[in-house]
């Protein structure tokens, strides 16, 4: 399914994209379940490798500078990078087949991992805010300014590359958890950017740059947190893009033999989309004919809605005057 509208351009749109990446909820092109799961695991592996290399470069800078504070910041960044491991485990578990106890499979583990990522972003915001206020009340002198600035630059580049990579693949495979983890990497990039800006401010003779930049970065992390929490919790509450429901209703209503669409319900299970629909068909049809209409409608639906892997269609004999029920169009 393509989108005809043009994305806005300019600095405001670019800033909005950083804090709230554009999303239509569904993915763009990867429709095979196994392929999308493999893409998610591959993304986690590559991003961990890049973050590990970033941390290694920062460790070299720490050794050359002898800065204890810089060493602590490097350890913090490395620990944050390891939060991708639960998501890796979630992707692996999500690929397991359904059982008699977990009849929908294990895809929901991915959404739980997304909740963990949101918790880590929340912790990052709290720590950043606390440190900024503490340095505002009790200013601390920044030593080894040049080395600190270099470490901040390396950290920002590495984390932002990982953020862009995870967010792009997350949109492509329909994984809210992977997008949230990309946003988490972006918050770490913000932290490194704060180090760089603070070092620059101190070098220019403005020591208060450190806590002020810290407060600004805290606000930026909170903006990212809002986006990540919204997307992950919508998945946990079975929220979907209303445009997908509209597309499904239109596709079903256009099928031969369908007199009305009673209802369409959708839910994400990890990065897989499931749908249930109720159709009204001609009451004169026999059971085999009604089944054929439902089967064809299911086939049409899986080709119309991106990332829809399973659909359950119920066909009912139409009653006189039946029509699509008015469920309202108010959406959040």
UniProtKB/Swiss-Prot annotation:
GO terms for cellular component: plasma membrane. Keywords: Cell membrane, Ion transport, Membrane, Transmembrane, Transmembrane helix, Transport. It holds the Pfam family Cation_efflux. The keyword Transmembrane helix applies. InterPro entries: Cation_efflux (IPR002524), Cation_efflux_CTD (IPR027470), Cation_efflux_CTD_sf (IPR036837), Cation_efflux_TMD_sf (IPR027469), CDF_Transporter (IPR050291). The chain crosses the membrane at residues 46-66, 75-95, 113-133, 145-165, 202-222. GO terms for biological process: intracellular zinc ion homeostasis. Induction: Transcription is repressed by KmtR. Induced by nickel and cobalt. The keyword Transmembrane applies. Belongs to the cation diffusion facilitator (CDF) transporter (TC 2.A.4) family. PANTHER family: MITOCHONDRIAL METAL TRANSPORTER 1-RELATED. NCBIfam families: CDF. This is Probable cation efflux system protein Rv2025c.
